[in-house]
Amino acid sequence: NKPVNNTNMGTKTAIPAPEVNSKAQDRVFDKMYITNVEKRLRELNSPSDNDKKRWVWELIQNAKDTIAKDQSRNTINIRIEISKDETNGDDIVRFRHNGSPFTADARLGLLYKYSEDKENQESTGRFGTGFLTTHCLSKVVTIESNMYSDDACEHICGFTVTMYRDGIIASELIDGLRKMRESETFFNETFDWTTFTYHVTSESGRQAIKLGLENFRENIAQTMLFCKELASVVLDDNGKITTIVRKPTTQLTEDIMLSEFEISGETNKVRRFIHTSYSEHDDDLSKRYRANRNMRIDAAVEVDDDNNLVDIEGKTTFFCVMPLVGIETQLNEPLIINSPDFEPDQERQSLLLSGITWNEEKDVITENGINRSIYKHIFPLYSKLVKYLADNQFGKLYYLANGLNRTKKHEKLDHEWYKLNVIDKYREILLQFTVADAQDGSGYKKLEECIFVKESIKDNEDK
């Protein structure tokens, strides 16, 4: 203790903070945590179908983000294992990856729900809320992993911890925090894989397994196209093994590539994507995030083995590295589009495309402004792809007009802006190229050179 001389206090003796202060601080922090998670956990008592589809992507995103700052790593491998508990018949979901160890901050961010680093442009995470979505499987989750045990990130230890987020009221959630802390165990030895284990006991959780795996199968090839960090992904669904492997990319032209993904399992197939990209320094992004930032965009179309375009109507075609599941109710366009710089809503189900584009008070671009700015760079990519496909006479080019006949109504979409600055732009580009296959055998024509005959419903049914 030492005397403190202050003209307002006289001479006082400083003492350590009273123990009651520390205990009160812990209680307040616990209540702040409850405030942070309670609403979302309550929503997940009756999860939406989109929630049930998203859990696998949230886990893949977390795995990918573990190497965002690790200069010694550029790829990870993932295993998803679905099995039955032989003792009680419950389903067990195990998600494994061999990414980098947790930092102390990242581990606590996962356990206490906050996003560690939105400013890192290599990190896909936005809000720290995504992992909560995985609780549509189960609100009790056991984690086995490794963490750096020193600030210099030179030493590693293993750990296990079980999250208990199954409480109904605040006091039960706080009790779950106590149980979580008591479950923590640290080891000198490390684990080969980071593993998240969910014991699924409810019908809703079993439905989440079903919808999540269906969405996984539909979108994993596109995700691997845009997420170069994924070297391989293996799904073991009760002994039925599916492996997705990236094949070497083929350079078709100076800026057009072909990427293929071999899917092996009960049936074998190869999914093929023709794609191009844009990456340039962006002043507005750099100013907003106080760091040198590039705007990055990928645009792709899927083609089959006969070089016909694949229909993407009604599918998830927008990616912020991971698929923005649910965005199909807002946007329907001719391309599969990815940008790590997209600004989605908090549940990653739509893009923010309404409201002001510039924050005058802070003198920075808004989330809406960023998304609109990304669109300006999509159209040159669309033009390159349409030209390549038309020049090489790919089939079913009418899919390049997908979504261009109408605009969806959505609360986060400025309908008038979207029609003038998106739909009309796509149409202008499409009119420039020979994309219509004439029925008289005279080859491909520009749309303005064609006469379109509207067939009756009966004629269409007969074809």
For each feature predicted by the language model, list its residue ranges.
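Alpha-helix N-cap/helix-initiation motif
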Residues: 45-49, 119-127, 367
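GHKL/Bergerat-fold ATPase module
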Residues: 2-21, 25, 38-42, 83-84, ...
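Flexible ATP-lid and adjacent glycine-rich G1/G2 motifs of the Bergerat
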Residues: 95-152
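Domain-wide signal for the mature, well-folded portions of proteins, strongly enriched
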Residues: 62, 66-70, 98, 104, ...
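Eukaryotic intrinsically disordered and solvent-exposed regulatory patches
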Residues: 43, 66, 127-129, 182-183
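Bergerat-fold GHKL ATPase/HATPase_c domain
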Residues: 1-76, 80-84, 104-113
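Short, highly conserved beta-strand within the GHKL-type HATPase_c fold
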Residues: 86-96
